[in-house]
Amino acid sequence: MELLGGPRVGNTESQLCVADGDDLPTYCSANSEDLNITTITTLSPTSMSHPQQVRDDQWVEPSDQLQGTAVFDATGDKATMPSWDELVRQHADRVYRLAYRLSGNQHDAEDLTQETFIRVFRSVQNYQPGTFEGWLHRITTNLFLDMVRRRARIRMEALPEDYDRVPADEPNPEQIYHDARLGPDLQAALASLPPEFRAAVVLCDIEGLSYEEIGATLGVKLGTVRSRIHRGRQALRDYLAAHPEHGECAVHVNPVR
């Protein structure tokens, strides 16, 4: 059992723990004959161009020296501005993992990942050196919250009062395969949370961000971050208590060491 996120100063709450077998597949490696998933690298917008392109035969193994987006983040030198290929190669896995944990399904996670990189590439020239991964967290999370609000608004405006709900279709084989690998118990517990609470818990207990970083990502005060995490964790406990078959599987709530 691995404690995700690690201890934090002044954080006496419990943290979400995930069983070691609940690893998410990486975004780019998800492209297989079984799933037939198109990777983001094939979706590079043709309308976007960048003078610095990276070919496959130019790729070298990482070294101890700063390279890629790390150089740009550290120096702010426009000459080291990353290309689309560099952004995707270095950050797609992490962005996809966050998008999946937030959205709870493969289709939305892929859409959020694609939209995140489009947004990043369009804005990278105006990026101020700081924490590049934190910037990615903020964009991904805000896009997710925007998606949730947009869908809620569409449902409220478009559905008539006498709308008959249609039962959901049975999960297709691709979704069954995907869920079996990704710990459906964990995702079901997270999906039970309101979007704002889910984002705070995912960023804290899965992505390992500090309360201050979460506040910057979500654009809320520190007290609001603490409240959302506390209430989100309590909601997880309530969910697990109501679904004991999940309590001994992939999701546990243990004290911070």
Curated annotation (Swiss-Prot):
Protein name, as recorded: ECF RNA polymerase sigma factor SigE
Entry-linked InterPro entries: RNA_pol_sigma-70-like, RNA_pol_sigma-70_dom, RNA_pol_sigma70_r2, RNA_pol_sigma70_r4_t2, RNA_pol_sigma_r2, RNA_pol_sigma_r3/r4-like, WH-like_DNA-bd_sf
Biological-process GO terms, alphabetical: biological process involved in interaction with host; DNA-templated transcription initiation; regulation of DNA-templated transcription; response to heat; response to xenobiotic stimulus
Region (Sigma-70 factor domain-4): 186-236
Pfam families recorded: Sigma70_r2, Sigma70_r4_2
CDD domains per record: Sigma70_r4
Protein's job: Sigma factors are initiation factors that promote the attachment of RNA polymerase to specific initiation sites and are then released. Extracytoplasmic function (ECF) sigma factors are held in an inactive form by an anti-sigma factor until released. Responds to heat shock and surface stress (detergent exposure). When combined with isolated core RNA polymerase from M.smegmatis is able to guide initiation from the sigB promoter. Required for full expression of sigB, and for sigB induction after detergent exposure but not after heat shock.
Keywords: DNA-binding, Sigma factor, Transcription, Transcription regulation
Gene3D superfamilies: 1.10.1740.10, Winged helix-like DNA-binding domain superfamily/Winged helix DNA-binding domain
Organism: Mycobacterium tuberculosis (strain ATCC 25618 / H37Rv)
Region (Sigma-70 factor domain-2): 87-153
Inducing stimuli: Unlike many sigma factors not directly autoregulated. Expressed from 3 promoters. P1 is 55 nucleotides upstream of the major start codon, used during normal growth, repressed by surface stress, P2 is at the start codon, under control of MprAB and is induced following surface stress and alkaline pH leading to a leader-less RNA, while P3 is 63 nucleotides downstream of the major start codon, transcribed from a SigH-responsive promoter under conditions of oxidative stress and heat shock.
GO molecular function, one term: DNA binding
SUPFAM superfamilies per record: Sigma2 domain of RNA polymerase sigma factors, Sigma3 and sigma4 domains of RNA polymerase sigma factors
Organism placement in taxonomy: Bacteria, Bacillati, Actinomycetota, Actinomycetes, Mycobacteriales
